């Protein structure tokens, strides 16, 4: 009869089984906390009452009854020596008893938790998604918290400032088995300057994008269309960012050469505090760069010193400026002085006002193309020179 009645009874549902397990687990956890509190309370009471009893016994024996003989004194003092040891043993016994209770309680608790975990795994395999989600939210909140932590991004969310854009790459999956499409350059518009790769977007590019973004027939709306000449905004980094993961060979080479992250300085933008690569110690103070994110021009901290000009270059420049005058001075002939006659006086011969000065040729009127003066004047003998001197007198 009982078997027939048990057949007609409905089996408990998964929710009811989990509720019963939750109640048992909660009772066992409360019992464990209760045992822990009772252990502390009993140990505290044992030590307190034993200390008070010990002090009272010492005071009574000292006040009313102290034997005169040495043997009597030892017999009276022996309980006072054994009493602390007895209290220590009682404390150890209490700790052992409560530890055994706690161990049995923990074993039952682990069994119930394992059974609950097994039922939850069966629920995830057998129940529908909606029922499984409700059961997990109700009876397994830890797994829900783990899923939320996994889905949440690690670190603070980056909000772009005004004038600063975050660069995202749109990667469209290519179909396997087909060759990649060859880009066909469109008609170039004359007069529109092309932007350098990695530079800030120019106006000419924005004017040509509406024509390039026209959707071709047969392409879906959501698929991105590649545009010729498009590049991420911002100039390239002033110096490349060194890789974080470096091998042993790279470290050895950096140690021998004296290069590496520990020997470089980071280029931080003064406006948006963004990292723009690393520069060497020698060029850090003299480098000026434009930020790759906010386009702010960061000036150099110091101006690079320039070496003074050598004096040889100045002398060469002076000589190259006036070569004709030097040539004229070197080309003038030095005529030998005419021998003076005995009759001639010490006074020099003065030419008349009307006589032209044929002997003196000014160097200012001479030109490089004129013939040299010594080629036109014939040489005279000593006798002819004496006759001409007498005629002048």
UniProtKB/Swiss-Prot annotation:
Gene Ontology CC terms: endoplasmic reticulum membrane; endoplasmic reticulum tubular network; endoplasmic reticulum tubular network membrane
Predominant location category: endoplasmic reticulum
Compartments in which it is found: Endoplasmic reticulum membrane
UniProt feature coiled coil, ranges: 95-130
Posttranslational modification: Phosphorylated. Phosphorylation occurs during interphase. Phosphorylation also occurs during mitosis; these phosphorylations reduce both its homodimerization and the ER three-way tubular junction formation.
Membrane topology category: Multi-pass membrane protein
Entry keyword Iron-sulfur: no
Zinc finger extent (C4-type): 269-294
Alphabetically ordered keywords of this record: Coiled coil, Endoplasmic reticulum, Membrane, Metal-binding, Transmembrane, Transmembrane helix, Zinc, Zinc-finger
Region Disordered: start-end pairs: 146-209, 314-393
Lumenal side, ranges: 67-69
Domain notes: The transmembrane domain 1 and 2 function as a signal-anchor and stop-transfer sequence, respectively, generating a double-spanning integral membrane protein with a N- and C-terminal cytoplasmic orientation. Transmembrane domain 1 and 2 are probably sufficient to mediate membrane translocation and topology formation in a N-myristoylation-independent manner. Transmembrane domain 2 is sufficient to block the protein secretion pathway. The two coiled-coil domains are necessary for its endoplasmic reticulum (ER) three-way tubular junction localization.
Protein name: Endoplasmic reticulum junction formation protein lunapark-A
UniProt lineage: Eukaryota, Metazoa, Chordata, Craniata, Vertebrata
